[in-house]
Amino acid sequence: LLFTPSYQNGVIKELVTEVPRDDFDVEKEGQVEIIGWLYQYYNEEPHDQVVNINGGPVKTDDIPAATQLFTTDWVVRYMVDNSLGKKYLEHYPDSPVKGKLKYLLPGDITPDQSDFDITRIQVMDNAMGSGHILAYAFDVLMTMYEDQGYAKREAANSIIQNNLFGLEIDRRAFQLSYFSLMMKLRRYDRQALNRSVMPNIHVFIAAPAVTEEFLHSLKASSEVIDEIQDIAAHFMDAKTLGSIIELPANYDYAGMRNALEPVATAQKISLFGNQQTAQQLLEIIATAETMTQRYDVVVTNPPYLNKMNSTLKKYVKKHYKDYSADLFSVFIWHNINMTKVNGYAGYMTPFVWMFIKSYEKLRTALLSNVKIDSLIQLEYSAFEEATVPINTFVLKNTKNDETGTYLRLSDFKGGMMIQAEKVQEAIADPGVKYLYRTNQT
């Protein structure tokens, strides 16, 4: 079991007293909400223990407990509606899809006359947790496929196989994401679990030791052998570094797979564990290939962590020096570079990056290279689970001085439900005093 059943304390008590009733309603897509809340409450005690240990660096095994927070539903909808939703409306501005994007903020939509194929729109969450963002993106994509004339069963299978991608360092969270997406698919295709349809999501594993004996078992060129050794070196600390690992753009993934697959599937068992090593390396290659793609939309609630252990701190200082104040700021910059030109990146992060000197280089880089398409500054204590003041925002990977949309909710106390109500009021009446339309300079 994930937890000890108890109605007096622990997970069940939290579910009964803290989770909105609608989140239990399967007809209202409540099953995904419940998976997320279950995992957050399951992690609540270890999270509190980890973040309060003498104020010291967080160990690799404790990073998931220290950094995982379930993203509030309306924030997920805001991020996806204003990134994936907006991407679609750039091609189809008069589509009825617009009316289904409940959290689409008022703002300009730049027409895009280029060819559009819904099966080629790719959405990434590279800190996916229990899959809340990807699950909602699935729903939005379903409305788009239907708008394009697809049958629901065909659309659902295409979404799982072509549109959604995810990365995660914690295996249990990965398993919940996998389950959530497969349940989404099964809703439209009852036979889905009987076929080999699999979501494009991956969990990070540390690279196995690549011995000389193992390398001798491979039938491959010296160039491919070198690449296998190189990718293994990059993933040595994958359980610590996860999605921020920087990889070469020109790996010969097909060549590496061709070298490893015969060993991974060999009938004769190797005394040296070569099959297992090859299988693990194939898993790493699939993860790496996902990491080195660029996406139309990247949306995530990144980890918030400034108490980095020595391995993470050294890597961040080397590869992300200007953004190293906190792990969330590393993700802000990293994810922009994961996004295609004119693509969108959505985030929920602490709002200190907008004000504090240690994030000045991040602010300068963003203002010089991307457009802040929209931003919502939440009331200081609205998101209690994060223990820090939060904002949520969407960046567009383009240099321009077009007008963005900003909501300042700092005057509205009462938690996340009040914040959601104020967002809805601003969407219904863009003339409210806390909505601003301005460029970022």
Tell me the role of every PLM-derived stretch.
Residues 1-159, 173, 302-306, 331, ...:
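Class I S-adenosyl-L-methionine
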Residues 16-26, 56-74, 118-128, 157-167, ...:
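Glycine- and acidic
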Residues 54-57, 139-143, 180-184, 216-220, ...:
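Short secondary-structure boundary/capping segments
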Residues 79, 167-175, 183, 323-377, ...:
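Conserved Class I SAM-dependent methyltransferase catalytic core
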Residues 101-122, 267-299, 311-319, 329, ...:
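Flexible, glycine/threonine-enriched loop-and-boundary segments that flank and lead into catalytic domains
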Residues 155-162, 169, 176, 198-206:
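Extended charged low-complexity segments that act as oligomerization/scaffolding linkers
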Residues 180, 191, 195-295, 368-373, ...:
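Polynucleotide-recognition surfaces of large bacterial nucleic-acid defense/processing enzymes
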Residues 296, 300-305, 351:
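Amphipathic alpha-helical repeat scaffolds
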